[in-house]
Amino acid sequence: MVYAKDKVAALRPAVEPAEKLGEGLSRRIIRTNQLMSVALDIEGGPWKEPEPLHSHPHEQTTYVASGEVLFCSEGSTPERLNAGDLIAIPSGVPHSIQLLSRSARLVDTFHPVREDFIKKG
């Protein structure tokens, strides 16, 4: 994780190794005191069904940098998103994705910072 606490910082994939989260899933994180962006690389698609819905108190935007996903949220029609699309998720709204392409890169931005994404110790 790159932390821009009191000066500008850059996240460079060649320098900052990805955190492996599971089979076909890795992320890189950059943050300030109030904002967090997460580059999420997903492989192993297409998936047969969406992930289970989840929610959190953080506001979120998701930019589809590559690939294609189906964005699902409670009470809304699923949105098919392609590279270049951006979606905003209010605090507390249950949501999930379904990978439609073989792989995708999503860039999630959260406010406030997702403390649960920060490794302790």
Show where each model-derived region lies.
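A short, N-terminal "cap"/entry segment at the start of jelly-roll beta-barrel domains
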Residues: 1-38, 52
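Double-stranded beta-helix
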Residues: 3-7, 35-36, 98-121
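Conserved short histidine dyad/triad with adjacent acidic residue
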Residues: 39-55
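A generic "binding-loop/recognition-motif" signal
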Residues: 57, 77, 93-94, 102-103, ...
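Glycine- and acidic-residue-biased ligand/ion/polar-headgroup-sensing regions
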Residues: 57-69
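Short beta-strand His + acidic residue motifs that chelate non-heme Fe in jelly-roll/DSBH
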Residues: 71-72, 89, 95-100
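Short acidic-glycine-tyrosine-enriched beta hairpin
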Residues: 75-91
